[in-house]
Amino acid sequence: MSDRHLSPLLSALTALLLPCLTATAQTGIAIDHDFGDWNPAGDLATADTVGPLVAAGFATDAENLYFHLVYDRLVALDESWEPHGTRLGVDIDGNTSTGQIVGGFQGADIVVHLQDRYVSESNTNGTTEQHSLNDRYVRMAPTYGGEEHEVSLGRAVNGVPVAGTVRWTVRCGSGQQVSGEVALDNTPALAMATPLERAEGAEVRVAFWNMNRRLDEAPALEAMGRILQAVQPDVIGMSEVEDFSAAHVRDLLDGWLPLEGGSWHVAKDDWDLMVCSRWPITTEYPDIYRQFPVLVDAPWAGDLMVAASHLKCCNGAEQRRTEADEYMAFLRDAMTEGGDVDLPSKTPVVYGGDLNMVGPGWAMQTLLTGNIHDEVANGPDFAPDWDGTALRELTCLQSDRAMDYTWRNDNSSWGAGKLDYILVQDGVVKVLREFSLETSSMTAERRTQYGLEPGDDLQASDHYIVVADLKKRDRRPGTKPVQLKKAN
Protein backbone atom coordinates (compact mmCIF):
# COMPACT_ATOMS: atom_id res chain seq x y z
CA MET A 1 0.00 0.00 0.00
CA SER A 2 1.21 3.50 -0.79
CA ASP A 3 2.72 5.57 2.01
CA ARG A 4 0.18 8.27 1.18
CA HIS A 5 -2.34 6.35 3.30
CA LEU A 6 0.07 6.08 6.24
CA SER A 7 1.50 9.58 6.72
CA PRO A 8 -0.77 12.21 5.18
CA LEU A 9 0.67 15.07 7.23
CA LEU A 10 4.36 14.46 6.53
CA SER A 11 4.63 17.27 4.01
CA ALA A 12 2.68 19.60 6.29
CA LEU A 13 5.10 19.02 9.17
CA THR A 14 8.04 19.67 6.89
CA ALA A 15 6.42 22.87 5.72
CA LEU A 16 5.99 24.06 9.28
CA LEU A 17 9.67 23.45 9.99
CA LEU A 18 10.85 25.11 6.78
CA PRO A 19 8.77 28.25 6.26
CA CYS A 20 9.58 30.41 3.27
CA LEU A 21 8.35 33.65 1.79
CA THR A 22 7.21 32.28 -1.53
CA ALA A 23 6.54 28.90 -3.13
CA THR A 24 9.26 27.16 -5.10
CA ALA A 25 8.26 26.42 -8.68
CA GLN A 26 8.32 22.78 -9.76
CA THR A 27 6.95 20.65 -12.58
CA GLY A 28 6.29 17.00 -13.39
CA ILE A 29 3.09 16.79 -11.33
CA ALA A 30 0.42 14.13 -11.75
CA ILE A 31 -3.05 14.54 -10.25
CA ASP A 32 -3.10 11.05 -8.79
CA HIS A 33 -3.38 11.12 -4.97
CA ASP A 34 0.37 10.52 -4.72
CA PHE A 35 2.14 13.57 -3.34
CA GLY A 36 5.71 12.46 -3.88
CA ASP A 37 6.03 14.88 -6.80
CA TRP A 38 5.47 17.85 -4.47
CA ASN A 39 8.35 19.46 -2.61
CA PRO A 40 7.18 20.01 0.98
CA ALA A 41 9.84 22.68 1.46
CA GLY A 42 8.00 24.75 -1.14
CA ASP A 43 4.73 24.76 0.81
CA LEU A 44 3.73 27.82 2.81
CA ALA A 45 2.42 27.20 6.34
CA THR A 46 -0.54 29.14 7.69
CA ALA A 47 0.16 31.67 10.41
CA ASP A 48 -2.24 30.15 12.94
CA THR A 49 -3.25 26.68 14.09
CA VAL A 50 -7.02 27.13 14.06
CA GLY A 51 -7.40 24.90 11.00
CA PRO A 52 -8.48 23.28 8.88
CA LEU A 53 -5.80 24.56 6.44
CA VAL A 54 -2.22 23.80 7.49
CA ALA A 55 -0.17 24.63 4.40
CA ALA A 56 -0.39 25.13 0.63
CA GLY A 57 1.94 25.05 -2.35
CA PHE A 58 1.75 26.18 -5.96
CA ALA A 59 3.41 25.16 -9.24
CA THR A 60 2.94 25.56 -13.00
CA ASP A 61 3.79 23.87 -16.26
CA ALA A 62 2.80 24.58 -19.85
CA GLU A 63 -0.72 23.17 -19.41
CA ASN A 64 -1.82 23.74 -15.84
CA LEU A 65 -1.59 25.66 -12.60
CA TYR A 66 -1.28 23.33 -9.60
CA PHE A 67 -2.18 23.68 -5.93
CA HIS A 68 -1.04 21.44 -3.07
CA LEU A 69 -3.33 21.63 -0.03
CA VAL A 70 -2.70 20.20 3.43
CA TYR A 71 -5.35 20.13 6.18
CA ASP A 72 -5.44 19.05 9.82
CA ARG A 73 -8.51 16.85 9.29
CA LEU A 74 -10.32 14.82 6.65
CA VAL A 75 -11.72 17.13 3.99
CA ALA A 76 -13.38 16.41 0.64
CA LEU A 77 -12.67 19.43 -1.53
CA ASP A 78 -15.99 19.56 -3.39
CA GLU A 79 -18.21 18.54 -0.45
CA SER A 80 -19.35 20.17 2.78
CA TRP A 81 -19.76 17.30 5.28
CA GLU A 82 -16.60 18.78 6.84
CA PRO A 83 -17.01 22.51 6.11
CA HIS A 84 -13.81 24.10 4.87
CA GLY A 85 -14.84 26.79 2.37
CA THR A 86 -11.55 26.57 0.46
CA ARG A 87 -11.07 29.15 -2.29
CA LEU A 88 -8.16 29.27 -4.72
CA GLY A 89 -7.35 32.69 -6.17
CA VAL A 90 -5.04 33.56 -9.07
CA ASP A 91 -4.01 37.01 -10.30
CA ILE A 92 -2.93 36.57 -13.93
CA ASP A 93 -2.59 40.23 -14.99
CA GLY A 94 -0.50 41.51 -12.10
CA ASN A 95 -2.97 44.29 -11.38
CA THR A 96 -4.19 44.34 -7.79
CA SER A 97 -6.80 46.98 -8.58
CA THR A 98 -8.76 44.62 -10.86
CA GLY A 99 -10.32 41.30 -10.10
CA GLN A 100 -11.81 39.92 -6.91
CA ILE A 101 -10.89 40.08 -3.24
CA VAL A 102 -10.14 36.79 -1.48
CA GLY A 103 -9.65 37.59 2.19
CA GLY A 104 -6.50 39.68 2.37
CA PHE A 105 -5.63 39.04 -1.28
CA GLN A 106 -6.66 41.63 -3.89
CA GLY A 107 -6.73 41.29 -7.66
CA ALA A 108 -7.78 37.65 -8.14
CA ASP A 109 -8.87 37.28 -11.77
CA ILE A 110 -9.83 33.63 -11.17
CA VAL A 111 -11.39 32.30 -7.97
CA VAL A 112 -12.11 28.58 -7.63
CA HIS A 113 -14.78 27.88 -5.00
CA LEU A 114 -14.00 24.23 -4.33
CA GLN A 115 -16.66 23.41 -1.75
CA ASP A 116 -19.38 25.15 -3.76
CA ARG A 117 -18.11 23.70 -7.08
CA TYR A 118 -17.77 26.72 -9.33
CA VAL A 119 -15.20 29.11 -10.77
CA SER A 120 -15.68 32.90 -10.74
CA GLU A 121 -13.75 34.80 -13.43
CA SER A 122 -13.38 38.57 -13.68
CA ASN A 123 -14.04 40.43 -16.92
CA THR A 124 -12.26 43.58 -18.06
CA ASN A 125 -15.46 45.60 -17.51
CA GLY A 126 -15.47 44.79 -13.80
CA THR A 127 -18.13 42.07 -13.89
CA THR A 128 -17.65 38.40 -13.06
CA GLU A 129 -18.80 35.23 -14.80
CA GLN A 130 -19.50 31.91 -13.13
CA HIS A 131 -18.34 28.62 -14.69
CA SER A 132 -18.42 24.98 -13.67
CA LEU A 133 -15.31 23.17 -12.50
CA ASN A 134 -15.41 21.12 -15.69
CA ASP A 135 -15.67 24.19 -17.93
CA ARG A 136 -12.39 25.46 -16.48
CA TYR A 137 -10.63 22.08 -16.37
CA VAL A 138 -10.39 21.93 -12.59
CA ARG A 139 -9.14 18.45 -11.64
CA MET A 140 -8.43 17.22 -8.14
CA ALA A 141 -7.33 14.19 -6.15
CA PRO A 142 -8.33 12.39 -4.08
CA THR A 143 -12.04 12.33 -4.88
CA TYR A 144 -12.84 11.23 -1.33
CA GLY A 145 -11.83 12.74 2.01
CA GLY A 146 -8.19 13.22 2.89
CA GLU A 147 -5.81 15.45 4.80
CA GLU A 148 -3.79 16.15 1.67
CA HIS A 149 -5.03 17.13 -1.79
CA GLU A 150 -3.81 18.37 -5.15
CA VAL A 151 -5.71 20.47 -7.69
CA SER A 152 -4.96 21.50 -11.27
CA LEU A 153 -6.46 24.36 -13.27
CA GLY A 154 -6.12 24.51 -17.07
CA ARG A 155 -4.03 27.44 -18.28
CA ALA A 156 -5.29 28.01 -21.81
CA VAL A 157 -9.01 27.82 -21.05
CA ASN A 158 -8.57 30.28 -18.17
CA GLY A 159 -6.57 32.84 -20.15
CA VAL A 160 -3.32 32.40 -18.23
CA PRO A 161 -0.54 34.12 -20.23
CA VAL A 162 2.40 32.17 -21.61
CA ALA A 163 4.99 34.24 -19.75
CA GLY A 164 5.35 36.44 -16.69
CA THR A 165 4.46 35.84 -13.06
CA VAL A 166 1.26 34.95 -11.28
CA ARG A 167 0.16 35.71 -7.75
CA TRP A 168 -1.84 33.04 -5.98
CA THR A 169 -3.69 32.51 -2.74
CA VAL A 170 -5.49 29.78 -0.80
CA ARG A 171 -8.05 30.75 1.83
CA CYS A 172 -10.37 28.67 4.01
CA GLY A 173 -13.73 29.76 5.30
CA SER A 174 -12.41 30.05 8.85
CA GLY A 175 -9.78 32.56 7.76
CA GLN A 176 -6.52 30.64 7.26
CA GLN A 177 -4.75 32.01 4.20
CA VAL A 178 -1.43 31.68 2.42
CA SER A 179 -0.33 33.57 -0.69
CA GLY A 180 2.67 33.63 -2.99
CA GLU A 181 4.03 34.66 -6.36
CA VAL A 182 5.86 32.52 -8.93
CA ALA A 183 7.18 32.84 -12.46
CA LEU A 184 5.18 30.89 -15.01
CA ASP A 185 6.94 27.71 -16.10
CA ASN A 186 6.38 26.50 -19.67
CA THR A 187 7.95 23.10 -19.20
CA PRO A 188 5.69 20.53 -20.92
CA ALA A 189 3.29 18.68 -18.67
CA LEU A 190 4.30 15.21 -17.53
CA ALA A 191 4.36 13.12 -20.71
CA MET A 192 2.24 9.97 -20.81
CA ALA A 193 2.01 7.32 -23.54
CA THR A 194 1.42 4.02 -21.77
CA PRO A 195 1.37 1.10 -24.22
CA LEU A 196 -2.06 -0.51 -24.36
CA GLU A 197 -0.55 -3.90 -25.15
CA ARG A 198 -0.17 -6.29 -22.25
CA ALA A 199 3.14 -6.03 -20.44
CA GLU A 200 5.83 -8.58 -21.13
CA GLY A 201 5.43 -11.50 -18.75
CA ALA A 202 1.81 -10.69 -17.84
CA GLU A 203 -0.29 -13.78 -17.18
CA VAL A 204 -3.69 -12.16 -16.61
CA ARG A 205 -5.07 -8.81 -17.72
CA VAL A 206 -8.01 -7.74 -15.56
CA ALA A 207 -10.33 -4.82 -16.28
CA PHE A 208 -13.29 -3.21 -14.56
CA TRP A 209 -15.87 -1.05 -16.30
CA ASN A 210 -19.17 0.61 -15.42
CA MET A 211 -21.17 0.12 -18.63
CA ASN A 212 -23.75 2.84 -17.76
CA ARG A 213 -26.63 0.63 -19.00
CA ARG A 214 -25.66 1.30 -22.63
CA LEU A 215 -25.29 -2.28 -23.85
CA ASP A 216 -28.22 -1.86 -26.24
CA GLU A 217 -27.20 1.51 -27.74
CA ALA A 218 -25.55 1.22 -31.16
CA PRO A 219 -23.11 4.17 -30.87
CA ALA A 220 -22.03 3.02 -27.40
CA LEU A 221 -21.59 -0.56 -28.57
CA GLU A 222 -19.33 0.53 -31.41
CA ALA A 223 -17.17 2.55 -29.01
CA MET A 224 -17.09 -0.29 -26.46
CA GLY A 225 -15.98 -2.71 -29.14
CA ARG A 226 -13.11 -0.49 -30.24
CA ILE A 227 -11.95 0.03 -26.66
CA LEU A 228 -12.07 -3.67 -25.77
CA GLN A 229 -10.28 -4.63 -28.98
CA ALA A 230 -7.56 -2.14 -28.12
CA VAL A 231 -7.26 -3.29 -24.51
CA GLN A 232 -7.75 -7.08 -24.94
CA PRO A 233 -8.67 -7.98 -21.34
CA ASP A 234 -8.84 -11.56 -20.07
CA VAL A 235 -11.29 -10.93 -17.23
CA ILE A 236 -13.76 -8.02 -17.02
CA GLY A 237 -15.79 -6.97 -14.01
CA MET A 238 -18.84 -5.01 -15.21
CA SER A 239 -21.36 -2.88 -13.34
CA GLU A 240 -24.66 -1.21 -14.30
CA VAL A 241 -25.63 -4.19 -16.47
CA GLU A 242 -28.81 -5.10 -14.58
CA ASP A 243 -30.98 -4.75 -17.70
CA PHE A 244 -29.01 -7.30 -19.69
CA SER A 245 -28.60 -11.06 -19.58
CA ALA A 246 -25.35 -12.95 -19.33
CA ALA A 247 -26.10 -14.45 -22.75
CA HIS A 248 -26.44 -10.99 -24.29
CA VAL A 249 -23.06 -9.90 -22.93
CA ARG A 250 -21.44 -13.20 -23.94
CA ASP A 251 -22.62 -12.71 -27.52
CA LEU A 252 -21.23 -9.16 -27.58
CA LEU A 253 -17.86 -10.32 -26.29
CA ASP A 254 -17.75 -13.21 -28.76
CA GLY A 255 -18.19 -10.64 -31.52
CA TRP A 256 -15.68 -8.12 -30.17
CA LEU A 257 -13.07 -10.53 -28.81
CA PRO A 258 -13.64 -13.95 -30.42
CA LEU A 259 -11.97 -16.90 -28.74
CA GLU A 260 -10.58 -19.69 -30.84
CA GLY A 261 -12.76 -22.77 -30.33
CA GLY A 262 -14.99 -21.36 -27.63
CA SER A 263 -17.04 -18.55 -26.09
CA TRP A 264 -16.62 -16.13 -23.25
CA HIS A 265 -17.76 -17.22 -19.79
CA VAL A 266 -20.13 -14.73 -18.16
CA ALA A 267 -21.55 -14.85 -14.62
CA LYS A 268 -24.26 -12.45 -13.42
CA ASP A 269 -25.25 -11.71 -9.83
CA ASP A 270 -28.74 -10.89 -8.58
CA TRP A 271 -28.40 -7.17 -9.33
CA ASP A 272 -26.18 -5.16 -11.69
CA LEU A 273 -22.81 -6.94 -11.69
CA MET A 274 -21.17 -9.39 -14.07
CA VAL A 275 -17.77 -11.03 -14.34
CA CYS A 276 -16.68 -12.09 -17.83
CA SER A 277 -13.70 -14.36 -18.46
CA ARG A 278 -11.82 -16.03 -21.30
CA TRP A 279 -11.38 -18.97 -18.94
CA PRO A 280 -14.06 -20.98 -17.08
CA ILE A 281 -15.71 -19.42 -14.05
CA THR A 282 -15.88 -22.30 -11.59
CA THR A 283 -17.63 -20.80 -8.56
CA GLU A 284 -19.87 -17.78 -7.96
CA TYR A 285 -20.63 -15.96 -4.69
CA PRO A 286 -23.65 -13.75 -5.49
CA ASP A 287 -24.89 -13.13 -1.94
CA ILE A 288 -22.59 -10.27 -0.95
CA TYR A 289 -24.47 -7.01 -1.30
CA ARG A 290 -23.32 -4.95 -4.31
CA GLN A 291 -20.18 -7.09 -4.65
CA PHE A 292 -19.73 -10.27 -6.69
CA PRO A 293 -16.70 -12.52 -6.21
CA VAL A 294 -16.12 -15.45 -8.55
CA LEU A 295 -13.39 -18.03 -9.01
CA VAL A 296 -11.70 -18.16 -12.41
CA ASP A 297 -9.69 -21.13 -13.67
CA ALA A 298 -6.67 -18.94 -14.41
CA PRO A 299 -3.67 -19.93 -16.56
CA TRP A 300 -1.32 -20.01 -13.59
CA ALA A 301 -1.08 -22.69 -10.90
CA GLY A 302 -4.32 -22.36 -8.95
CA ASP A 303 -7.38 -20.17 -9.30
CA LEU A 304 -7.92 -16.44 -9.41
CA MET A 305 -10.70 -14.77 -7.43
CA VAL A 306 -12.13 -11.64 -9.05
CA ALA A 307 -14.67 -9.53 -7.18
CA ALA A 308 -16.68 -6.97 -9.17
CA SER A 309 -18.12 -4.16 -7.08
CA HIS A 310 -20.56 -1.28 -7.37
CA LEU A 311 -20.82 0.37 -3.96
CA LYS A 312 -23.55 2.78 -2.93
CA CYS A 313 -23.50 6.10 -4.76
CA CYS A 314 -23.33 9.68 -3.62
CA ASN A 315 -24.16 10.54 0.00
CA GLY A 316 -24.12 6.90 1.10
CA ALA A 317 -20.87 6.87 3.08
CA GLU A 318 -22.34 4.86 5.95
CA GLN A 319 -23.80 2.29 3.55
CA ARG A 320 -20.53 2.03 1.62
CA ARG A 321 -18.76 1.32 4.90
CA THR A 322 -21.31 -1.39 5.73
CA GLU A 323 -20.87 -2.91 2.27
CA ALA A 324 -17.09 -2.88 2.64
CA ASP A 325 -17.42 -4.55 6.05
CA GLU A 326 -19.54 -7.33 4.53
CA TYR A 327 -17.06 -8.00 1.73
CA MET A 328 -14.08 -8.01 4.06
CA ALA A 329 -15.83 -10.51 6.34
CA PHE A 330 -16.25 -12.72 3.27
CA LEU A 331 -12.58 -12.29 2.32
CA ARG A 332 -11.40 -13.07 5.86
CA ASP A 333 -13.48 -16.26 5.81
CA ALA A 334 -12.10 -17.19 2.38
CA MET A 335 -8.50 -16.70 3.51
CA THR A 336 -8.80 -18.70 6.75
CA GLU A 337 -9.60 -22.35 7.31
CA GLY A 338 -13.15 -23.21 8.24
CA GLY A 339 -16.33 -21.25 7.65
CA ASP A 340 -18.20 -21.11 4.37
CA VAL A 341 -15.34 -20.52 1.91
CA ASP A 342 -11.79 -21.87 1.92
CA LEU A 343 -9.33 -20.60 -0.67
CA PRO A 344 -6.04 -22.43 -1.07
CA SER A 345 -3.23 -20.40 0.46
CA LYS A 346 -1.95 -17.56 -1.74
CA THR A 347 -4.87 -17.69 -4.19
CA PRO A 348 -4.77 -14.17 -5.69
CA VAL A 349 -7.84 -12.03 -5.06
CA VAL A 350 -8.50 -8.93 -7.18
CA TYR A 351 -11.23 -6.49 -6.18
CA GLY A 352 -12.45 -3.61 -8.31
CA GLY A 353 -15.15 -1.63 -10.00
CA ASP A 354 -17.14 1.55 -9.50
CA LEU A 355 -16.67 2.11 -5.78
CA ASN A 356 -18.34 5.55 -5.79
CA MET A 357 -15.65 6.58 -3.33
CA VAL A 358 -16.67 10.08 -2.29
CA GLY A 359 -17.33 11.51 1.15
CA PRO A 360 -15.02 10.57 4.04
CA GLY A 361 -13.61 7.46 2.34
CA TRP A 362 -14.24 5.16 5.32
CA ALA A 363 -15.04 2.24 3.02
CA MET A 364 -11.72 2.57 1.21
CA GLN A 365 -9.80 2.36 4.46
CA THR A 366 -11.70 -0.81 5.36
CA LEU A 367 -11.09 -2.36 1.95
CA LEU A 368 -7.38 -1.55 2.00
CA THR A 369 -6.52 -2.39 5.59
CA GLY A 370 -9.11 -4.94 6.77
CA ASN A 371 -10.08 -2.58 9.60
CA ILE A 372 -13.73 -3.56 9.95
CA HIS A 373 -16.02 -0.90 11.42
CA ASP A 374 -18.86 -3.06 12.77
CA GLU A 375 -17.03 -6.00 14.31
CA VAL A 376 -20.15 -7.20 16.12
CA ALA A 377 -21.87 -7.93 12.81
CA ASN A 378 -18.83 -8.73 10.67
CA GLY A 379 -16.13 -10.09 12.95
CA PRO A 380 -12.61 -8.93 13.77
CA ASP A 381 -10.08 -6.97 11.76
CA PHE A 382 -7.57 -8.90 9.66
CA ALA A 383 -4.76 -8.41 7.17
CA PRO A 384 -6.30 -8.80 3.68
CA ASP A 385 -3.10 -9.79 1.83
CA TRP A 386 -1.63 -13.26 2.16
CA ASP A 387 1.66 -11.74 3.33
CA GLY A 388 -0.02 -10.11 6.32
CA THR A 389 -0.16 -6.58 4.91
CA ALA A 390 -2.77 -4.24 3.46
CA LEU A 391 -4.04 -4.35 -0.10
CA ARG A 392 -2.51 -2.17 -2.79
CA GLU A 393 -4.68 0.45 -4.47
CA LEU A 394 -3.57 0.82 -8.08
CA THR A 395 -3.22 4.37 -9.36
CA CYS A 396 -4.39 3.50 -12.88
CA LEU A 397 -3.24 6.82 -14.34
CA GLN A 398 -4.76 7.56 -17.71
CA SER A 399 -2.64 6.14 -20.50
CA ASP A 400 -2.10 9.55 -22.12
CA ARG A 401 -2.66 12.13 -19.37
CA ALA A 402 -1.14 12.38 -15.90
CA MET A 403 -4.56 12.32 -14.23
CA ASP A 404 -6.35 9.56 -12.32
CA TYR A 405 -10.02 10.53 -12.79
CA THR A 406 -12.21 7.76 -14.24
CA TRP A 407 -15.61 9.48 -14.27
CA ARG A 408 -16.36 12.62 -16.23
CA ASN A 409 -19.57 14.46 -17.06
CA ASP A 410 -18.84 17.86 -18.55
CA ASN A 411 -22.45 18.97 -17.94
CA SER A 412 -22.33 18.23 -14.22
CA SER A 413 -21.47 20.59 -11.38
CA TRP A 414 -19.33 17.78 -9.96
CA GLY A 415 -15.78 17.76 -11.21
CA ALA A 416 -14.22 14.74 -12.86
CA GLY A 417 -13.13 12.22 -10.25
CA LYS A 418 -11.73 8.79 -9.61
CA LEU A 419 -14.61 6.43 -8.88
CA ASP A 420 -13.25 3.22 -10.42
CA TYR A 421 -10.56 1.21 -8.68
CA ILE A 422 -8.49 -1.96 -8.72
CA LEU A 423 -7.22 -3.36 -5.40
CA VAL A 424 -4.75 -6.25 -5.45
CA GLN A 425 -2.85 -8.49 -3.06
CA ASP A 426 0.63 -7.49 -4.13
CA GLY A 427 2.07 -10.07 -1.78
CA VAL A 428 1.03 -12.76 -4.28
CA VAL A 429 0.88 -10.91 -7.63
CA LYS A 430 3.17 -8.48 -9.39
CA VAL A 431 1.53 -5.56 -11.17
CA LEU A 432 3.32 -5.16 -14.49
CA ARG A 433 1.15 -2.46 -16.05
CA GLU A 434 -1.90 -0.42 -15.04
CA PHE A 435 -3.90 2.36 -16.66
CA SER A 436 -7.28 3.86 -17.41
CA LEU A 437 -8.25 4.99 -20.89
CA GLU A 438 -9.39 8.47 -21.93
CA THR A 439 -9.35 8.36 -25.73
CA SER A 440 -9.94 12.10 -26.08
CA SER A 441 -6.54 12.86 -24.53
CA MET A 442 -4.63 10.55 -26.89
CA THR A 443 -2.79 11.91 -29.92
CA ALA A 444 -4.27 11.17 -33.33
CA GLU A 445 -1.31 8.90 -34.04
CA ARG A 446 -1.89 6.88 -30.88
CA ARG A 447 -5.60 6.52 -31.58
CA THR A 448 -4.89 5.34 -35.11
CA GLN A 449 -2.37 2.84 -33.77
CA TYR A 450 -5.03 1.24 -31.58
CA GLY A 451 -8.09 1.73 -33.80
CA LEU A 452 -9.78 4.25 -31.52
CA GLU A 453 -11.86 7.40 -32.07
CA PRO A 454 -11.55 10.65 -30.06
CA GLY A 455 -15.00 10.38 -28.49
CA ASP A 456 -14.96 6.66 -27.72
CA ASP A 457 -14.38 7.22 -23.98
CA LEU A 458 -17.62 9.08 -23.23
CA GLN A 459 -19.57 7.49 -26.08
CA ALA A 460 -19.09 4.11 -24.45
CA SER A 461 -19.87 5.18 -20.88
CA ASP A 462 -19.48 8.01 -18.40
CA HIS A 463 -16.83 5.86 -16.69
CA TYR A 464 -13.45 4.89 -18.09
CA ILE A 465 -12.23 1.32 -18.18
CA VAL A 466 -9.44 0.54 -15.66
CA VAL A 467 -6.90 -2.15 -16.53
CA ALA A 468 -4.07 -4.07 -14.81
CA ASP A 469 -1.58 -6.71 -15.96
CA LEU A 470 -0.76 -9.29 -13.31
CA LYS A 471 1.82 -12.02 -12.84
CA LYS A 472 1.66 -14.52 -10.00
CA ARG A 473 4.67 -14.37 -7.72
CA ASP A 474 4.94 -18.08 -6.89
CA ARG A 475 4.19 -19.76 -10.22
CA ARG A 476 5.61 -23.28 -10.23
CA PRO A 477 9.11 -23.52 -11.76
CA GLY A 478 9.04 -24.71 -15.33
CA THR A 479 5.44 -23.65 -16.05
CA LYS A 480 4.67 -20.99 -18.62
CA PRO A 481 1.76 -18.57 -18.85
CA VAL A 482 -0.85 -19.24 -21.52
CA GLN A 483 -0.24 -17.22 -24.67
CA LEU A 484 -3.46 -15.77 -26.04
CA LYS A 485 -4.23 -15.25 -29.69
CA LYS A 486 -5.06 -11.59 -30.28
CA ALA A 487 -8.46 -11.08 -31.87
CA ASN A 488 -8.69 -9.26 -35.15
Question: What is the predicted function of each stretch?
Answer:
Residues Q26, V151, V157-V160, S174-A189, ...:
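Metal-dependent phosphoester-hydrolase catalytic domains
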Residues V70-D72, F208-R213, M238-E242, W264-D272, ...:
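Active-site-proximal beta-strand/loop segments in catalytic clefts of secreted hydrolases
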Residues V178-W256, K268-L273, D303-L304, Q319-D325, ...:
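N-terminal, active-site-proximal structural segment of metallo-dependent hydrolase catalytic domains
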Residues S11-C20:
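Bacterial N-terminal signal peptides
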Residues A76-E79, T98, D216-P219, F244-V249, ...:
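Extracytoplasmic/secreted cell-surface and envelope-processing proteins
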Residues Q26-D32, H84-Q115, Y144-E147, R155-A202, ...:
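Acidic/polar low-complexity flexible segments
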Residues T27-Y118:
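Surface-exposed, glycine/proline- and aromatic-rich loop segments on solvent-exposed faces
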Residues V241-G316:
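Structured beta-strand-rich core segments of catalytic domains in phosphoester-bond hydrolases
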